[in-house]
Protein backbone atom coordinates (compact mmCIF):
# COMPACT_ATOMS: atom_id res chain seq x y z
CA UNK A 1 0.00 0.00 0.00
CA UNK A 2 1.47 3.39 -0.95
CA UNK A 3 2.20 5.97 1.72
CA UNK A 4 -0.20 8.86 2.18
CA UNK A 5 0.81 11.99 0.31
CA UNK A 6 1.91 15.03 2.33
CA UNK A 7 -1.24 16.82 1.12
CA UNK A 8 -3.48 14.02 2.43
CA UNK A 9 -1.65 13.97 5.76
CA UNK A 10 -2.19 17.73 6.04
CA UNK A 11 -5.88 17.28 5.22
CA UNK A 12 -6.18 14.70 8.02
CA UNK A 13 -4.46 17.06 10.48
CA UNK A 14 -6.84 19.88 9.53
CA UNK A 15 -9.86 17.60 9.87
CA UNK A 16 -8.71 16.40 13.29
CA UNK A 17 -8.00 19.93 14.50
CA UNK A 18 -11.37 21.24 13.26
CA UNK A 19 -13.44 18.93 15.51
CA UNK A 20 -13.71 19.80 19.19
CA UNK A 21 -15.13 18.09 22.26
CA UNK A 22 -18.65 19.35 22.85
CA UNK A 23 -19.51 19.98 19.19
CA UNK A 24 -23.02 18.82 18.31
CA UNK A 25 -24.39 17.74 14.94
CA UNK A 26 -28.08 17.07 14.26
CA UNK A 27 -30.01 15.25 11.53
CA UNK A 28 -33.78 14.76 11.35
CA UNK A 29 -35.87 12.66 8.98
CA UNK A 30 -39.29 11.07 8.66
CA UNK A 31 -39.18 7.38 7.75
CA UNK A 32 -41.32 6.17 4.83
CA UNK A 33 -42.47 2.82 3.44
CA UNK A 34 -39.96 3.38 0.65
CA UNK A 35 -37.11 3.68 3.17
CA UNK A 36 -38.08 0.35 4.73
CA UNK A 37 -38.44 -1.37 1.34
CA UNK A 38 -35.05 -0.13 0.15
CA UNK A 39 -33.35 -1.12 3.40
CA UNK A 40 -34.91 -4.60 3.36
CA UNK A 41 -33.90 -5.00 -0.28
CA UNK A 42 -30.29 -4.02 0.37
CA UNK A 43 -29.83 -5.98 3.62
CA UNK A 44 -32.08 -8.97 2.99
CA UNK A 45 -33.64 -8.42 6.44
CA UNK A 46 -36.86 -10.40 5.97
CA UNK A 47 -37.97 -10.19 9.59
CA UNK A 48 -41.80 -10.34 9.72
CA UNK A 49 -41.84 -7.58 12.35
CA UNK A 50 -40.82 -5.23 9.52
CA UNK A 51 -42.93 -6.69 6.70
CA UNK A 52 -46.01 -8.54 7.95
CA UNK A 53 -48.70 -6.28 9.41
CA UNK A 54 -50.75 -9.21 10.74
CA UNK A 55 -47.76 -10.88 12.40
CA UNK A 56 -46.51 -7.64 13.95
CA UNK A 57 -50.04 -6.68 14.96
CA UNK A 58 -50.24 -9.74 17.21
CA UNK A 59 -46.96 -8.84 18.93
CA UNK A 60 -46.30 -6.32 21.69
CA UNK A 61 -45.38 -3.84 18.91
CA UNK A 62 -49.03 -3.87 17.71
CA UNK A 63 -47.86 -2.95 14.19
CA UNK A 64 -44.87 -3.21 11.87
CA UNK A 65 -41.75 -1.40 12.99
CA UNK A 66 -38.79 -0.31 10.94
CA UNK A 67 -35.45 -2.15 11.20
CA UNK A 68 -33.35 -0.87 14.09
CA UNK A 69 -30.27 -0.52 11.91
CA UNK A 70 -32.23 1.70 9.53
CA UNK A 71 -32.79 4.13 12.39
CA UNK A 72 -29.20 3.71 13.61
CA UNK A 73 -27.89 4.47 10.13
CA UNK A 74 -28.88 8.12 10.59
CA UNK A 75 -25.52 8.56 12.33
CA UNK A 76 -23.78 7.67 9.07
CA UNK A 77 -25.38 10.72 7.44
CA UNK A 78 -23.74 12.94 10.04
CA UNK A 79 -20.51 10.97 9.87
CA UNK A 80 -20.46 11.38 6.10
CA UNK A 81 -20.92 15.13 6.40
CA UNK A 82 -18.00 15.16 8.86
CA UNK A 83 -15.88 13.01 6.55
CA UNK A 84 -15.72 10.60 9.51
CA UNK A 85 -14.54 6.99 9.21
CA UNK A 86 -15.86 4.85 12.05
CA UNK A 87 -13.76 2.09 13.56
CA UNK A 88 -16.41 1.05 16.09
CA UNK A 89 -20.16 1.59 16.53
CA UNK A 90 -22.50 0.46 19.32
CA UNK A 91 -26.26 0.89 19.69
CA UNK A 92 -28.91 0.25 22.30
CA UNK A 93 -32.45 0.02 20.94
CA UNK A 94 -34.89 1.47 23.47
CA UNK A 95 -38.25 1.85 21.70
CA UNK A 96 -39.63 0.85 18.31
CA UNK A 97 -39.73 3.29 15.41
CA UNK A 98 -42.60 3.11 12.91
CA UNK A 99 -43.19 4.29 9.36
CA UNK A 100 -44.21 7.94 9.58
CA UNK A 101 -42.15 8.64 12.70
CA UNK A 102 -39.83 11.64 12.58
CA UNK A 103 -36.55 10.87 14.32
CA UNK A 104 -33.88 13.35 15.37
CA UNK A 105 -30.32 12.06 15.62
CA UNK A 106 -27.89 14.10 17.71
CA UNK A 107 -24.17 13.35 17.59
CA UNK A 108 -21.98 14.90 20.30
CA UNK A 109 -18.19 14.81 20.18
CA UNK A 110 -17.29 13.44 23.63
CA UNK A 111 -13.59 12.57 23.52
CA UNK A 112 -10.61 13.59 21.44
CA UNK A 113 -7.53 11.34 21.61
CA UNK A 114 -4.59 13.39 20.35
CA UNK A 115 -2.21 10.42 20.48
CA UNK A 116 -4.38 8.09 18.36
CA UNK A 117 -5.94 11.01 16.45
CA UNK A 118 -9.38 9.55 17.08
CA UNK A 119 -12.69 10.72 18.48
CA UNK A 120 -15.50 9.14 20.43
CA UNK A 121 -18.98 10.50 19.72
CA UNK A 122 -22.19 9.81 21.62
CA UNK A 123 -25.34 9.50 19.54
CA UNK A 124 -28.94 9.89 20.73
CA UNK A 125 -32.14 9.43 18.77
CA UNK A 126 -35.56 10.80 19.76
CA UNK A 127 -38.91 10.52 18.03
CA UNK A 128 -41.41 13.28 17.30
CA UNK A 129 -42.84 12.87 20.82
CA UNK A 130 -39.44 13.52 22.42
CA UNK A 131 -39.05 9.87 23.48
CA UNK A 132 -35.54 8.42 23.28
CA UNK A 133 -35.73 5.47 20.87
CA UNK A 134 -32.07 4.60 20.44
CA UNK A 135 -28.69 5.57 21.84
CA UNK A 136 -25.13 4.60 21.22
CA UNK A 137 -21.74 5.79 20.22
CA UNK A 138 -19.02 5.52 17.66
CA UNK A 139 -15.27 5.85 17.55
CA UNK A 140 -13.13 6.75 14.58
CA UNK A 141 -11.32 9.52 12.81
CA UNK A 142 -12.17 12.38 10.46
CA UNK A 143 -10.78 12.09 6.96
CA UNK A 144 -12.00 15.37 5.51
CA UNK A 145 -12.62 18.92 6.66
CA UNK A 146 -16.26 18.96 5.49
CA UNK A 147 -18.31 19.63 8.60
CA UNK A 148 -22.06 19.34 9.03
CA UNK A 149 -23.53 22.53 10.39
Residue ranges with predicted function:
Residues 1-21, 97-149:
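HotDog/MaoC-like acyl-thioester-processing domains
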Residues 2-85, 146-149:
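Hot-dog-fold acyl-thioester-processing enzymes
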Residues 81-105:
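Mid-chain, well-packed structural core segment of small domains
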Residues 75, 93, 107-109:
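Conserved hydrophobic positions within beta-strands
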Amino acid sequence: MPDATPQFKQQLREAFDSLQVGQIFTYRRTFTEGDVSLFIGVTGDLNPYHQDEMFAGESWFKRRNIPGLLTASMATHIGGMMGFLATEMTFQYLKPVYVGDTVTCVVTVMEKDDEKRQFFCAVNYTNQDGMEVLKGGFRGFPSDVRLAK
